[in-house]
Amino acid sequence: MGKIIGIDLGTTNSCVAVLDGGKARVLENAEGDRTTPSIIAYTDDETIVGQPAKRQAVTNPNNTFFAIKRLIGRRFKDDEVQRDVNIMPFKIIQADNGDAWVESRGNKMAPPQVSAEILKKMKKTAEDFLGEEVTEAVITVPAYFNDSQRQATKDAGRIAGLEVKRIINEPTAAALAYGIDKKQGDNIVAVYDLGGGTFDISIIEIDSNDGDQTFEVLATNGDTHLGGEDFDNRLINYLADEFKKEQGLDLRKDPLAMQRLKEAAEKAKIELSSTNQTEVNLPYITADATGPKHLVVKITRAKLESLVEDLIIRTLEPLKVALADADLSVSDINEVILVGGQTRMPKVQEAVSNFFGKEPRKDVNPDEAVAVGAAIQAGVLSGDVKDVLLLDVTPLSLGIETMGSVMTKLIEKNTTIPTKAQQVFSTADDNQSAVTIHVLQGERKQASANKSLGQFNLDGIEPAPRGMPQIEVMFDIDADGILHVSATDKKTGKKQNITIKASSGLSEEEVAQMVRDAEAHAEEDKKFEELVQSRNQADGLVHATKKQVEEAGDALPADDKAKIEAAMSAVEVATKGNDKEAIEKATQELIEASAKLMEIAQAKAQTQGGAQEGAAKQSNATADDVVDAEFEEVKDDKK
């Protein structure tokens, strides 16, 4: 059985880890980095992922997608999506099913389809390290992701060619990474996870006793649309406003300028974590009739903190709710762990420290802990990690709509999963022959104020006065936090059941089509890679042959030289095209045309060998007797 890998599919950066010799190991990607920017770009002829995509974003802003995780499993009309529509340089559109999709070069794409490109890169990174195909993964999601967002993440995995063995909450994964080596005692840990696009707080009890470890999530809370991207946007807007005040031009109308501004804002934010002042200097950011314009703005740490103060305060309310749900006070928390790149900001650390009355731990890597935890969970599932029990919870209450548009809860938030719950309902009207089961997720009493997960009908109910039929509704949440619902007429035994797919979401056919598309692209990518290899080999051969022709000098007959030069020209022409077979044919013809060159080189090597042997035997030879040129040529030959 192949390895199950652990993937942190982040809003800003993603990371992959595997168990190696019993320890979780974070893997370096092809660029040599341990984290990969969650950025995908589409050009005329290829899809670019990670750092290369980030580098070309300034020149291709409309087709470079970032923070796609903020759209996954969401409806276009959601308030959070509408906020992003106005600030993202790329196009966010409404799909036929009401979901938020994106558009590039006329192609409409679902967020899981775009996210799958990042997962494919993570998969390839793991395969390069392991030397074998990878088909299974544990993927992390924010603890506060709802059912639709979890389903969409699983869809992304399938499109990338991965069977998602488990969806695990990010703070829980971080706690696993932190606690796996803590062998004794009972600790209550608060995991404060402020990433690129989402915020979570989880209160987790780690019980380590005689080699057995239990990680039990006591409560979780958060905000799935609050993170480092929002901090960046505050700074971007400030810079744009300052420029408008000074120059009278609104950079928000220029996607190219906004992409440069985004890069500069992110860089300035990072710098202000270690310095008190920085300067954003962007020459030629735009131009008008009077000529080019430059943006130069000094920003202090205090200014940045004032711009984002309310965002930091927003993270504190979920902390209070999570503690109350766990029936704990601040003094009950033994350790505080910070996860997510945005927690590197000193003001965030200060706010967390003040809230809990203790300094957060500094021995957990905020960028890698989640992927490490995912790899450990993968090890638990494969049997490589023993004596670890993980008890996670459902973040939001689940129920159905009942009479008067009320949400009746069947499973309360923070219930340990997997779990089941059932309740008997009845009809609202006399002789009602069918009921609609409308499944909801959320904490509000009013049904319409909660997230609709989907609905289905149970028909064939025998005519009876209202309140008489007995309809048993069962909710079953699996270990991924995904809901399965059934409704049974207790009298007739008629049953209807579904795995909740969001009222939006991708259909099975759409996912299957996207999987096929991804497989087709994989074949294209393989062919492209083989073409590049053939080109490189051909270029290398031409370079080496030119050098040998020069070294052979007059020893190479004129007709052989003409043949070789013609063959080299043919290779150079072939490498400019995209026909791999033509390149390989021209390369082979050059090898054959160079046969005489090889003979000359071998003869020369033998002559040089003899000369050296003779020189060694001359006991009275002086240094001047040694022919330097011959030694130099031997060195070159060895190269």
From Swiss-Prot:
Region span, Disordered: 603-639
Phosphothreonine: residues carrying this PTM: 198
GO molecular function, one term: ATP-dependent protein folding chaperone
Induction profile: By stress conditions e.g. heat shock.
Purpose of the protein: Acts as a chaperone.
Keywords: ATP-binding, Chaperone, Nucleotide-binding, Phosphoprotein, Stress response
The family this protein is said to belong to: Belongs to the heat shock protein 70 family.
InterPro entries: ATPase_NBD (IPR043129), Chaperone_DnaK (IPR012725), Heat_shock_70_CS (IPR018181), HSP70_C_sf (IPR029048), HSP70_peptide-bd_sf (IPR029047), Hsp_70_fam (IPR013126)
Compositional bias per record (Acidic residues), positions renumbered to this chain: 625-639
KW Cytoplasm (keyword) present: no
PANTHER family named among the record's database cross-references: HEAT SHOCK PROTEIN 70KDA
Biased composition, class Low complexity, residue ranges: 603-618
Pfam families from the UniProt entry: HSP70
Origin superkingdom: Bacteria
Protein name: Chaperone protein DnaK
